[in-house]
Amino acid sequence: MMLGGGGGCGAGGTWLGFLVFLAVSLRNHSTCEDIDAEDRLMVDLFRGYNSLVQPVRNRSELPMIVKIGMQLVLLINVDEKEQVMHTNVWLTMKWDDFQLKWDPRDYANITQIRVAPEKVWLPDIVLFNNADGNYEVSFMCNVLILSTGTVLWVPPAIYKSSCIIDVEFFPFDDQLCSLTFGSWTYNRDEIKLDFLTSDRVDFSEYSTSSIWDMMDGPAVLTSDRSRIEFQIRIRRKTLFYTVVLILPTVLMAFLNVTVFYLPTASGEKMGLTMNVLLSIVVFLLLVSKILPPTSSSIPLVAKYLLLTFVLNIITIMVTTIICNIYFRSPITHRLPPWVRKVFLDILPLLMCMQRPHRKNVIQRSHRRLLETGPSVEENPMRSGEHHPLCRHTHNQDSCRRVRIQSDELDDELSPEAQRAIDAIEFITENRRDEEITKQFRDDWKFIASVVDRFLLYGFFGATVGGTIGIIFTAPSVFETFDENATLVKLKQLYDMGLANDTVLGIF
């Protein structure tokens, strides 16, 4: 029993090995037949084929239709200074070649083959608006040929195309760049272009950019269908420029306003304005290095910098005038009545500036003079009747009477006492003149403070108005944009082959 069982197992193993050998042999035979069939197909297809001749039976079949599609893979860069867009695309071209048809049943059911591009006729489609002299694709990949005679060529390419940059709303700007393709040697009567599957750019393999948001990608055919233009509409991501350029510029503009809040006596007004001026010049140079030197429009950020620059220049001028007013004195300048009326009475009231009343100041000054001035109590005359102080009393009759009595007693004073009285009179006159001069200087200083406050309000309003009127005029300042959702809708539009952008409500 055991021996019999062992013999059965040996026979079963032999049969299993034979079946495996037979299957492998049949598979190798089938593979060899497929290879032989493909070789025969290649020989049959390209026997007498001329890749330099346009594949049409006769001239009546012209113009030949070449369908083109473009798949955007990567937006590498947009150089605003050079006005060049750098992209990585897959260009898809499709046409029919009657010489490359076959019956798959005659060639082991082979429905498609891949051949080198130099073996077949290729349409000389080039990028017309290239910016580096490279008109053709950079990599000559294989051509896919179907049994129906349809030829499909999908060469990848990295293009540098010219793009007119609109800098009016920089950095809150949208740009519309295009890639224009067409035949270099065939005219419109020999080749006509058409869309491959949709009149749009294919974004199915697109990798998002860290600088630009993709908004749309329509395609346009010229009226004679000799050229096709793939448009790429993009919007700049503004976070970087907002933090690095916009916010510092706005802060500098408002820092320029604080000059009028800085006391003139500190001596730092002019230093602050000059530092702000140098900062603005640095930012202007930075913007000039980023943007193209175009004269068609002034960039939004350049407008704001120019406004800040002009306000700073005016600030320097009026600060010089304020410093001149602050250090005026009655010796060099006379205070006109209208200046006193406007800057000491009207403007302080309008700007809620309070100043102690002039009479109270004079009375306190006189009281201070009486308390700290020289005394004549040791003189035989009463101190209240000494004539140098009679000017400070309110009783003019008493003053005249004291002066008469003082003149009658001048002869009775010794020379030393007379010299002392003259010295006291001289000192008193000087103190009185100093008080009057100080009062006039205080008036000029207060006028300078009033002008400072008036310009503080005026320049603050101008800065706020300029900020709102310039920066907030950009169309996309307050718009939120979801690039991922937009790309999903653009892919749906491409798959549907729609020409109407409003179907999905994107824009």
Swiss-Prot record:
Biological process terms in GO annotation: chemical synaptic transmission; inorganic cation transmembrane transport; monoatomic ion transmembrane transport; regulation of egg-laying behavior; regulation of locomotion; regulation of membrane potential
Record keywords: Cell membrane, Disulfide bond, Glycoprotein, Ion channel, Ion transport, Ligand-gated ion channel, Membrane, Postsynaptic cell membrane, Receptor, Signal, Synapse, Transmembrane, Transmembrane helix, Transport
Signal peptide: 1-31
Pfam families assigned: Neur_chan_LBD (PF02931), Neur_chan_memb (PF02932)
Start-end of Basic and acidic residues biased regions: 379-392
Outcome of gene disruption: RNAi-mediated knockdown causes a resistance to nicotine-mediated paralysis.
Glycosylation sites: N28, N58, N109
Matching Gene3D superfamilies: Neurotransmitter-gated ion-channel ligand-binding domain, Neurotransmitter-gated ion-channel transmembrane domain
InterPro entries in the cross-refs: Neur_chan_lig-bd (IPR006202), Neur_chan_lig-bd_sf (IPR036734), Neur_channel (IPR006201), Neuro-gated_channel_TM_sf (IPR036719), Neuro_actylchol_rec (IPR038050), Neurotrans-gated_channel_TM (IPR006029), Neurotransmitter_ion_chnl_CS (IPR018000), Nicotinic_acetylcholine_rcpt (IPR002394)
Membrane topology note: Multi-pass membrane protein
SUPFAM superfamilies cross-referenced by the UniProt entry: Neurotransmitter-gated ion-channel transmembrane pore, Nicotinic receptor ligand binding domain-like
GO molecular function, one term: acetylcholine-gated monoatomic cation-selective channel activity
Quaternary structure and partners: Interacts with unc-29. Component of nicotinic acetylcholine receptor composed of 2 non-alpha subunits lev-1 and unc-29, and 3 alpha subunits unc-38, unc-63 and lev-8.
Protein name: Acetylcholine receptor subunit beta-type lev-1
Lineage: Eukaryota, Metazoa, Ecdysozoa, Nematoda, Chromadorea
